[in-house]
């Protein structure tokens, strides 16, 4: 009987710990969608309690001076597929790369192209499709 009670209490404590961790993860992912305040923005805190109090597409979010109005930033979602494997990526080159950087994220590439490291530079590349095993 003691073992059963200990097990139940242990599971309850684990559930509480996981719930708190999940809440922190959700908060961190929401927080990362907003730009860091610039020195000018940092001096002006527009306090709010709910999103309805905010103009246009701004949202009420936790900040350094309480809940304040912030404008979300489009962080983009990675496109489907993977970057092709490139043997030259694993070999360190000597000297500067002669090619120009074309992109820094998938959203800068047209269509379904992905921003991948090819040779020594980031460039828009056709993706390798995701293969699902059944």
Swiss-Prot record:
Keywords: Disulfide bond, Milk protein, Protease inhibitor, Repeat, Secreted, Signal
Domain of life: Eukaryota
Domain WAP: 27-73, 76-128
SUPFAM superfamilies: Elafin-like
PROSITE patterns: WAP (PS51390)
Compartments, record wording: Secreted
Tissue-specific expression: Milk-specific; major protein component of milk whey.
Gene Ontology CC: extracellular region
Record keyword Disulfide bond present: yes
Post-translational modifications reported in the UniProt record: No phosphate or carbohydrate binding could be detected; however, both cholesterol and triglyceride are associated with the mouse protein.
CDD domains given in the database record: WAP (cd00199)
GO-annotated molecular function: nutrient reservoir activity; peptidase inhibitor activity
Cystine residue pairs: 45-65, 48-60, 83-116, 97-120, 103-115, 109-124
UniProt signal peptide: 1-19
Keyword Signal in annotation: yes
Functional note: Could be a protease inhibitor. May play an important role in mammary gland development and tissue remodeling.
Name recorded for this polypeptide: Whey acidic protein
GN (gene name): Wap
